[in-house]
Amino acid sequence: RNAEMQREIMINEITNVTGEVFMGMGVGCAQCHDHKFDPILQKDYFALQAFLSSVYWPDDRYHATEEEISKYEKDSRTWDETTEGIRDEMKSLLEAGARKTYEFRVKTFPPEVQVMFRKPWEEKSAYERQISFLVERQAEREVRTLATAEKILKKGSAELQRYGELKEEMAFFENLKPEDLPKAFVSTDTGREGAVVRMKEEEVSPGFLELLGGEVPEIEVREGTSGRRSALAEWLVRGDHPTTARVMVNRIWQHHFGKGIAASPNDFGMLGEEPSHPELLDWLAGEFVKGGWKMKRMHRLIMTSAAYRQTARFEPSNVHEVIDPENKWLWRFSPKRLSAEQIRDAMLAVSGELRHRDGGAAQTSAVPVRSIYVKKMR
């Protein structure tokens, strides 16, 4: 029931992942104290977190075209109008019990969280909106699980019998209900106001890491958003940013060779491994930026290189095997394991069952399309 702690864990995780994925820095070590090995200050951690603290995840956005959404909404309205009488009667039979269950669940949260939740939306701060979002999702999920007819209505009652009749009638219309559009997993801000981040009770403003310049960000507040995440994103993809491009091309290299030029892709600091070919890493990063940060271009550049097209044949008598048995200097191509998705696609291809397609909606793994089109729940 600790919605505040849940929110804290989520924001900390986002901050840590942002540092590792885009900057190659284990910033999480600076959450409780200054980093013991890298020059990352604790105040830098919370300044980075201040960019991300207002995020929340709406669940009402569709991953579909305007035409698909328009047709879906039209068909849904027709279905709603047709079944309105049945649904209203079913709802009225359960309403008192459902409302009681909902209120009971809300009351299990700490008193200060209940106060935040019951405030009018326009009076809530960004932090209070995030907490309310978490409380509402938990309470609604438990109502769906607990507030069933069998648990609310008295056994053998006329109300339970009537509900069963309505349920049978509704089953016919369920088959006619428009198929739900796929939901888009998106994040947005709670509003124009940024959520307050504190370090030892002191409010911390968004700021870039001292290690990487420590300049004061220019944040443009726009309608419905604090503008903080946009400011962070624009800083990360600046051409002169010292880490982002290097970290990204290192990940692409790792995808193709099984091991990055820097073998610790999430940590370019003192605890990570030094790049085996630092000049190559710098050059690839420069090409990545010059090419407009286009990943397809970088994939093509690496896959057409002499290093990638080398043989993987193992010859024990080769002098290179004696000098560099780990192939650190890339004198041959190191075999690497295929991913589960690559194995799946290969099996479908050799069996002749693979369906070739370009684009379209995501599918379940049971549909024989390439794995790039298969939903992956995280």
Predicted regions and their residues:
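Sequence context surrounding c-type heme c attachment/ligation sites in exported
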Residues: R1-E81
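Long, charged alpha-helical "stalk" segments
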Residues: T82-R105
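Short amphipathic alpha-helical segments and their helix-coil junctions
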Residues: E4, C29-C32, E112-M116, R229-L236
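Primarily short, surface-exposed interaction patches in extracytoplasmic proteins
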Residues: E8-I11, P39, T78-M90, S125-R378
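Extracellular structured ligand-interaction cores
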Residues: T15, Y45, V113, R344, ...
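Short His/Asp/Glu-rich catalytic/ion-coordination signatures at enzyme active sites or charged loops
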Residues: R1-M5, S54-T82, R105-E159
